[in-house]
C-alpha cells in the first residue's frame, strides 16, 4: 500500500493558525470577522465582504502569510498521520495539498517532516483529483487500489471513494 497524505489540516492541524492569520489580516484593513467559524478562508471573507476587490483579497492573503510565518507554533503535527510517514518512509509515502506551496514548505520544515517522496500541489477539483490518482500511480508504479489517501475534506473524500480509492478520513482538531 502507498500512502498519500494531505498536509493542510490533516498532517498538520492548521485551523487555529489559518484563522488567526485571517483575523490579523482583517484587523489590518479595519474589518473583523462577521461570525465565529472553525476556519476562516478566502471564500468566507468574500461572503462576508463581497465589496472587496481581487486586489484586496490578494493583499489580505499576503497579510495572512506574514502572520503565519511568525506564528507557526500555532500549528500542531497530527501524531497519528505523522507516524504513517515515519513507519512507511519516503519509498511508500507522498504528500498532496491545495494550500500555498510556500506555506506548506514552512510547515513541513517547522515540524521536521521529511519522510515523503514527493508533494503534489492540487486544486482538488474532481478532475484534478482523478489526475492526482493517476500521477501517484505513476510515481509509485502501482494500481489505484494500492493507494490509501489521508484527507480531512469531506468532498475530496467522497470523490476519492467514488473512484474506488481507500481513504482514511481525518477529523480536524477541535480548536480550544
What are the residue ranges of the model-derived segments?
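Short glycine/proline-centered loop/turn elements that form peptide/ligand docking sites
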Residues: 83, 133, 153-159, 167-176
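Helix-loop "lid/cap" segments that line or gate small-molecule binding pockets
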Residues: 25, 42-55
